Swiss-Prot record:
Chief location category: mitochondrion
GO molecular function annotations of the record: translation release factor activity
InterPro entries: PCRF, Pep_chain_release_fac_I, Pep_chain_release_fac_I_sf, Prokaryotic/Mito_RF
Name of the gene: mtrf-1L
Family the entry assigns: Belongs to the prokaryotic/mitochondrial release factor family.
Organism listed in the record: Caenorhabditis elegans
One Pfam family of this chain: RF-1
Keywords: Methylation, Mitochondrion, Protein biosynthesis, Transit peptide
Annotated localization: Mitochondrion
A GO cellular component entry from the record: mitochondrion
Lineage: Eukaryota, Metazoa, Ecdysozoa, Nematoda, Chromadorea
Function statement: Mitochondrial peptide chain release factor that directs the termination of translation in response to the peptide chain termination codons UAA and UAG.
The record's account of how the chain is modified after translation: Methylation of glutamine in the GGQ triplet is conserved from bacteria to mammals.
Protein name: Probable peptide chain release factor 1, mitochondrial
N5-methylglutamine modified-residue sites: 259
Length: 389
């Protein structure tokens, strides 16, 4: 208290020129950490760490490291809260001069901003990174839904949007299957994408995307849909799908015509023996390339099943669905008439459909907000259940 008072007095003597900043709004993560359950969780972690340091308990080195990071960050949060308390005491003290109280009010805003930052950092420390958070490979599957030709055009626009997003983020974009429509648009597509933390950024694009607009050849508003699936692809396919775990059958490729169709058995069907899951691949001219693609596709499907099984064990109030459940959920509407894109999961609307579809800053902003919501969901689950290990 004395130290804070001396700091304010020194500033007053120097007659510093002070600039007020806008008030800081608390995030959902901060609210959780400031709650009774949040404080209980942090106290439990600090107590467990103290017991280990005193030799009264034991824990794995990685567990102790996790507790230490939370304990150190929570100490910074405690310091910030203490400073705020001291400043508010000065503000409410009638014996203080008006100048001193004004300086304290300005400092309150600055400390609140710093405290919000420290709370956000504490949230990141509490929610540990898992393999999916750092996965550098994923597969994006697009399928046109209701709406006929308009749905195919919209699916093509989404495909272009994600390709531009990949370019912006310097991701590798590898089309595995693309079913283009002669009149324009895409019926379906399967893309392998790789890059730093690509799955973490793309996973919440999974779901039903809806477009509302007036087609060029009509005067009425049309509503069309496209479905997006985002599957995690393992870093090492052979670990998830060993060669002896599958049955590979050669087939003749089918298609509209050409030298290679029905003449050579280049297409393959790969069946996972344990689960019976089968994938077909015939887009490449050479069989070994189709086999490689089939392995990747099967590995992604099996990894998705593992993710689904893991999520089934978690009972929480998550706003964002991850995995197979997300595919049937209507997640976003692109309204051309009102030039607005709305994500229904986080109740976020952004103006500028064209910029959004061109993978501009607005798309990046929405992806970041979805990641923040995911962090909040996981933080809520950990704190509510006091999961300290």
């Amino acid at each position: 208290m004395l130290k804070r008072h001396q700091q304010l007095l020194f500033r007053l003597i120097r007659q510093s020129v002070l600039h007020q900043s806008s008030p800081t709004s608390s995030s959902a993560s901060s609210t959780l950490l400031n709650s009774e359950n949040g404080e209980k969780f942090v106290k439990t972690v600090v107590d467990r760490l103290a017991q280990c340091q005193a030799g009264n308990a034991t824990a794995a080195p990685e567990q102790i490291s996790y507790w230490e990071s939370i304990s150190k960050q929570s100490a910074k949060v405690s310091d910030g809260r203490s400073e705020l308390s001291q400043l508010r005491t000065i503000i409410n003290d009638p014996k203080e001069t008006e100048e001193m109280r004004k300086l304290a009010e300005v400092d309150v805003e600055s400390i609140e901003e710093n405290l919000e930052t420290e709370l956000q950092e504490l949230a990141v420390k509490i929610v540990p990174l898992n393999n999916l958070d750092v996965l550098s490979k994923c597969q994006i599957e697009l399928s046109c839904g209701a709406g006929g030709q308009e749905a195919m055009l919209f699916t093509g626009e989404l495909l272009d949007m994600y390709q531009k997003l990949a370019a912006v983020n310097s991701w590798k974009w590898d089309p595995l299957q693309v079913d283009n429509v002669p009149l324009g648009g895409v019926r379906s597509a399967l893309i392998a994408v790789s890059g730093e933390k690509v799955y973490a950024k793309m996973r919440f694009e999974a779901g039903v995307h809806r477009v509302q607009r007036v087609p060029v050849n009509d005067s009425r508003m049309h509503t069309s849909t496209a479905s997006i699936s985002v599957l995690p692809e393992p870093e090492e396919v052979s670990v998830v799908v060993p060669s002896d775990s599958v049955k590979i059958e050669a087939m003749r490729a089918s298609g509209p015509g050409g030298q290679n169709v029905n003449k050579r058995s280049t297409a393959v069907r790969m069946t996972h023996k344990e689960t019976g899951i089968a994938v077909h691949c015939m887009d490449e001219r050479f069989q070994h390339l189709n086999i490689q693609i089939a392995y990747k596709r099967l590995a992604a499907i099996l990894m998705q099943k593992q993710v689904d099984a893991m999520l089934e064990k978690i009972v929480s109030k998550r706003k964002l669905q991850v995995g197979s459940k997300a595919r049937a959920e209507k997640i976003r509407t692109y309204n051309f008439q009102h030039d607005r894109v709305t994500d229904h999961r986080i109740q976020m609307s952004i103006t500028g459909v064209a910029e959004f579809l061109s993978a501009g800053e607005t798309l990046q902003t929405m992806i970041e907000r979805l990641q923040e919501q995911h962090l909040e969901d996981r933080l809520d689950h950990i704190i509510e259940n006091c999961i300290v290990e």
